[in-house]
Amino acid sequence: MTSKKKLINFSDRIFIAGAAGLVGSSLKKLFIEKGYGKIDKRGIILSPSRKELDLTNSLEVENWFKKNNPDVVVIAAAKVGGIIANSHNPVNFLLENLKIQNNIIESSWNNGVRRLLFLGSSCIYPKESIQPIKEEYLLNNSLEKTNEAYAIAKITGLKLCEYLRRQYKFDAFSLMPSNLYGPGDNYNLQNSHVLPALIYKFHKASITNQRELTCWGTGKPLREFLFVNDLANACIFALENWDFEKDIFPTDNNKNKLSWINIGSKEEITIFDLAKKIAKLTNYTGIINWDQSKPDGTFRKKLDISNATYLGWESKTTLDQGLKITYQNFLKNYSTKKLKK
C-alpha cells in the first residue's frame, strides 16, 4: 500500500547524517541512482564529513542547519559495535548516540525540516520477546545487558520522534532494521559486529593456513541478517511512500499509532551455520572451536515485518548473495589496505 504521490521530491535538499558509514554510503549511492540530488532538478545531497560537522556539538549542528536548510533528513549516524565494544564502553555508547540523535532531531524540528527518518536497531526489543518480534513489543520486558546502553539510546531517539509527531505534528518516523552487513563494514575484531568479525577472522585463518580458530559463545543463537543495500532501499521507499496520516498501523497500549516499523530479511540462521558458510566462502578448512565462556547475547531476534510488507516493501538479497558481494568487497579493500578497522 503506497501513496500515489511521492512524499519527497527530486528538488529536495536531503541531509544524510553518517553518509560515510555502512548505511549512509549505501543510501547516498541509491538516492543518486534514483535521481535525487541532481543540480538540473535543483536537488542536493548534503553529506558533511566528521571534520566538516561534529554531530555531537549541538551549537555546531544548529548553525549548520540554519545555513544549509535541509528539507529531508536521514539519521544514519551512530556509534556502533559488537558485544565487546558495547560491554566495555557503555557510557560512550549511551552519551555519544544520545548527543548525535538529539542534536539532529531537535535542529530538524527547529529549522522546518519537512520529513525526518531515524534509523534504530532491533536491539531495542526485549531480550526475552515473543518471536517474531512485533513493533508493539517494545518495552514489554528487560533488554539484553551486553548492548543495553546502545539500545536505550536508540529507544530514546525513536520515542523523541514519536512524541514530536504526536505533540507538534512534526513528520518524523523510524525504521528498526535487523542485523546489518555489507560492503564498507567495520572489520575491527574489538568493536565490529559478528558477521564482519567472522569474515575477517576466517579470511586471516585461511590465508595463514591456521589449523583451527575459536569463535565466541555456543554458536546456537539465531540471527536475521539484512543486506545494507536492502535497508537503503527501504529507507527511500518509506520516505517516498509512508503517509502516516493515511496508512493503518498497530497502536501501543494507549491506542497511540506507532511511528516506526521493522525492516528485515525474514531469513534466519544460527551463528554456527553462519560460521560454516563464511568458512566455505573464505576457503578455510581447519577446525572451528567455540568458547562457551563468552556471551552469546540474545538467543533469537527475528523481526515481524508485516507492516513493511503491507506498505509494499520486501528485501531482495538472500544471505548467500549478500555474503558473496560483501566478501568480494572485503578482498578488494584488504588487498589495498582500505578496510575499516
Q: What is the predicted function of each stretch?
A:
Residues K145-S178, A197-T208:
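Active-site Tyr-X1-5-Lys
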Residues L94, L98, T146-L158, N188-P196, ...:
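Short-chain dehydrogenase/reductase
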Residues S58-L98, N110:
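NAD(P)H-binding glycine-rich loop region in Rossmannoid oxidoreductase-like domains
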Residues N102-N147, F173:
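Conserved Rossmann-fold NAD(P)-dependent oxidoreductase catalytic core, especially the SDR/UDP-sugar
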Residues K34-N63:
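Adenosine-cofactor binding site in Rossmann-like domains, unifying the SAM/SAH pocket
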Residues A19:
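NAD(P)H cofactor-binding loop motif with strongest signal on the N-terminal glycine-rich segment
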Residues I124-P126, A149, F173-A197, P221-L222:
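Flexible, glycine-rich beta-alpha linker
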Residues K6, S11, L22, S26-L30, ...:
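C-terminal substrate-binding subdomain of Rossmann-fold SDR/epimerase-dehydratase oxidoreductases
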